[in-house]
Each structure stands twice: as structure tokens, then as C-alpha cells.
């Protein structure tokens, strides 16, 4: 908490984008590098949780993607918040930065957030996105990737088959690729 001092902000939105998945937004008053995180709490006395920024660095709002965890200490309360309610957030931190270089992005579930930020910030040339999810509705923001990335947007779904979707785990899709370097960590 000392590394990430918290300040109050009024939320501007808290929309559900899939079952148990939300995007909380508030006015941006800082600059950040795509891939960074902020700390978030509902009350200053509680330990904050870290969330990757999903908005682009030129967007007027900060977007935080989160998954409702029934029985959790924060997300059940977060999911009930309305525009105008106050949360406590830090400035940006972390060093998982995007790059303009050709890259393979690998994410599952809400782990897509930093790549959404990179994409919306213009770091979207020569990218491949491998996105894992349990259900077809788990590919958050897929509309932003489908047309532009075309064959470089790979969706791996473990529980539901679908057209153009690899039915299985993301890790299995990676193992089946012969053209990926085997000595790298994915």
C-alpha cells in the first residue's frame, strides 16, 4: 500500500460484459504505459487488489476488467457499484510494457486486459494473440481483435466447441505448434 498510495475517484461505469465479468471505469488523470496496473480498494483501510489497465493510453477513462468471485472479499462488492460511487485507486505501476516489435501475446480470461490496453494504444502491428477461455463468452473484447488480426487471433476454448475456435487448452495448442521456439517460456 505504501508503494501505491490510494486516492478516491468516482466511477463512471461498471458494466457487465459477460457472465460474472465487468469493466469498471473512471476518469483518467494520469499517464501510463500499456501493460501497467493500478491498485484498487473500496475502502482505504483494506488491502487493495492489483488490476491491469485495459483502456488505451489515449482514452479518457481508465478501464479495469474484473471477474466476480462469489465469496470473494472485493469483487462481490465491486459488482454492485454504480456510476458516482467512490473507489480508491493508485497511480500506475509495474513494468510489463507493450512493444512495437512483432510479438506473440498469450492470455486467458481477464488476463487479456494488458493486451487490450496495448491494442487500443496502437501497439497492434505484427501481433499474434492466443486467447484461452472456458466458454465461448470468455473471449472478452474479441470484436476488437477478430477482424484486424484475422488468422493471428487464436481462440482456445476448453468447454464449448465453436466455429473457428480450437477446442482444448491454450497450452495444448502451443504444444502442437512446430514453428514456435521450444526453448522459450510461454
Label each PLM-derived region with a short phrase.
Residues 1-83, 159:
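Ferredoxin-reductase
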Residues 73-186:
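FNR/FR-type flavoprotein reductase catalytic core
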Amino acid at each position: 500500500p505504501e508503494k501505491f498510495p490510494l486516492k478516491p475517484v468516482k466511477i463512471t461505469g461498471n458494466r457487465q460484459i459477460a457472465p460474472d465479468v465487468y469493466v469498471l471505469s473512471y476518469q483518467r488523470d494520469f499517464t501510463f504505459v500499456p501493460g501497467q496496473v493500478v491498485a484498487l480498494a473500496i475502502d482505504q483501510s483494506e488491502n487493495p487488489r492489483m488490476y491491469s489497465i485495459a483502456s488505451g493510453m489515449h482514452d479518457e477513462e481508465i478501464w479495469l476488467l474484473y471477474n466476480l468471485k462469489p465469496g470473494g472479499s472485493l469483487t462481490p462488492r465491486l459488482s454492485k457499484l454504480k456510476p458516482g460511487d467512490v473507489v480508491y485507486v493508485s497511480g500506475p505501476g509495474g513494468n510489463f510494457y507493450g512493444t512495437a516489435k512483432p510479438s506473440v501475446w498469450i492470455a486467458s480470461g481477464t488476463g487479456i486486459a494488458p493486451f487490450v490496453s496495448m491494442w487500443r494504444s496502437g501497439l497492434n502491428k505484427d501481433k499474434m494473440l492466443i486467447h484461452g477461455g472456458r466458454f465461448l463468452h470468455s473471449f472478452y473484447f474479441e470484436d476488437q481483435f477478430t477482424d484486424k488480426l484475422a488468422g493471428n487471433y487464436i481462440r482456445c476454448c476448453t468447454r464449448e466447441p465453436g466455429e473457428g475456435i480450437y477446442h482444448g487448452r491454450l497450452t495444448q495448442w502451443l504444444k502442437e505448434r512446430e514453428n514456435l521456439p521450444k526453448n522459450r517460456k510461454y
